[in-house]
Regions:
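FAD/FMN-dependent oxidoreductases across multiple families
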Residues: 160-197
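Glycine- and aromatic-enriched mobile tails/lids
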Residues: 94-105, 109-110, 120, 181, ...
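An anion/pyrophosphate-binding glycine-rich loop and adjacent beta-alpha core
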Residues: 56-167, 171, 219, 233-239
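Core beta-strand elements of the Rossmann-like FAD/NAD(P) dinucleotide-binding domain
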Residues: 8-19, 194-198
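Short beta-strand segments that buttress and anchor functional surface loops
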Residues: 1-6
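Glycine-rich loop(s) and the adjacent beta-strand/alpha-helix scaffold that form part
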Residues: 19-76, 80, 128, 217-233
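Glycine-/small-residue-rich beta->alpha transition segments that form the dinucleotide
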Residues: 8, 17-19, 23-28, 166, ...
Length: 310
C-alpha cells in the first residue's frame, strides 16, 4: 500500500493495496545546479527515494536532458519550453552580437551545451532579473515563410508571450536550456517490475529506456507501451479476489420475511464487504395498504435483528 497526502485537506491517507505502481515523474523541481525546469511542481524525485528505501536499484542517476530552448525572459515564463518546431520553421539561434553560432536542429545536448558556453563566455544577453540567454530569432519565420506564419502555426507561443507585451513576430525570444527530462531512474524489467515485491514503476521515474540521452517524443513509449505493460503485469500478479456473492443478501431477506407486519423494505441493502461498516436498517411501520398506495403513520420503534452482527 501507500501513505498519501491529500493536498486539499492537508491530511495523510493510508491506502492498502497488494500492488503499487510508481508513476511520480522526474525530479526537475530540485533545480539541479540552479537550472530552471519545465517539469510540473510534483517532480521532486520522491519516487526515486521511495523505491531506493524499498531496496530497488537505480541507474543512470547522473543523466538528465536539458532542453535547449527554455524561456529565459520574462521571469513568469522562465523554464517553459519553446518547441523545436519553431527552429525547424526558420527561427535561428544567435548570441548577443547577432552571430549565429550553431545549427538549430542539432542534437539537444549539443545545442544546449553550445548555448551554455556562449553565456559563460559573456556572449549572451542579460535580463533585468539577472538571468542570461541567447536570442531565438522568431521574426525570421514570417520573413522566410510569409507574414502571419508564426501566428498561424504557433498560436500558443504567440499568445503566451503577448500576455507580457512581447510579439514574437517582431521581437526575438530569449532562451536558455531548461532541466527537462530525467534519463535515469528506477531499474525495471520489460514489464515495469522492480526488485521490491508488489512494486512496479512506469514513466519518467524509471531508468534505462532512453539510456543516457533521448530523442524528442520518446517519452510516448513510457505512456503507450511500458505504462500499459506495468499495469497489466501488476494486475496479473495479484492473487485471485474473493468473488462477490448474494449469500448475505439472501440471508437478510429471509430474516425480514419473518417480520409479520412488514410489507416492504425501504432502505438500501448493502454488502458488508462494500459498506465497510455496520449497516443500520431503518424501517417504517406499515399500515394496511390503502387505495391510494402505501402510507406510514410514523417511524417504527421495532428493532429488527441485525443480519450482520456476529
Amino acid at each position: 500500500g501507500a501513505v498519501l497526502w491529500d493536498r486539499n485537506k492537508g491530511d495523510l491517507v493510508t491506502v492498502s493495496a497488494r500492488a503499487v505502481i510508481l508513476a511520480t515523474g522526474g525530479s526537475g523541481q530540485l533545480r539541479l545546479q540552479g537550472f530552471p525546469t519545465s517539469n510540473h511542481l510534483g517532480a521532486t524525485g520522491d519516487g526515486l527515494v521511495l523505491a531506493y528505501r524499498q531496496g530497488c536499484k537505480l541507474l543512470h542517476g547522473e543523466s538528465y536532458q536539458y532542453h535547449p530552448s527554455g524561456t529565459a525572459y520574462p521571469e513568469a515564463l522562465v523554464g517553459q519550453l519553446v518547441t523545436e518546431s519553431i527552429r525547424s520553421t526558420g527561427a535561428q539561434v544567435v548570441n548577443a552580437e547577432g552571430e549565429r553560432f550553431i545549427g538549430e536542429m542539432t542534437f539537444r545536448d549539443v545545442l544546449a551545451a553550445a548555448i551554455i558556453r556562449e553565456v559563460a563566455e559573456k556572449r549572451g544577453a542579460q535580463t533585468p532579473t539577472h538571468r542570461a540567454g541567447v536570442w531565438l530569432d522568431t521574426p525570421l519565420i514570417d520573413i522566410i515563410n510569409g507574414e502571419g506564419t508564426l501566428r498561424r502555426q504557433f498560436p500558443g507561443i504567440v499568445h503566451r508571450f503577448e500576455r507580457y507585451q512581447i510579439d514574437p513576430a517582431k521581437q526575438p525570444i530569449l532562451i536558455y536550456p531548461t532541466l527537462h527530462y530525467q534519463n535515469g531512474g528506477i531499474q525495471v524489467d520489460r514489464d515495469g517490475c522492480t526488485e521490491a515485491k508488489g512494486l512496479w514503476a512506469a514513466g519518467e521515474v524509471t531508468g534505462g529506456l532512453h539510456g543516457t540521452n533521448r530523442l524528442m517524443g520518446n517519452s510516448l513509449l513510457d505512456i503507450t507501451v511500458f505504462g500499459r505493460r506495468a499495469a497489466l503485469s501488476a494486475q496479473n500478479d495479484l492473487p485471485p479476489r474473493r468473488p462477490v456473492t448474494l449469500t448475505c443478501l439472501k440471508k437478510s431477506r429471509e430474516q425480514f420475511k419473518n417480520i409479520s407486519d412488514r410489507r416492504e423494505v425501504l432502505s438500501p441493502q448493502l454488502f458488508p464487504t462494500q459498506a465497510g461498516m455496520k449497516v443500520a436498517f431503518e424501517l417504517q411501520k406499515a399500515e394496511e395498504p390503502s387505495a391510494t398506495g402505501f402510507n406510514s403513520s410514523g417511524p417504527s420503534t421495532y428493532e429488527p435483528p441485525d443480519p450482520f452482527s456476529k
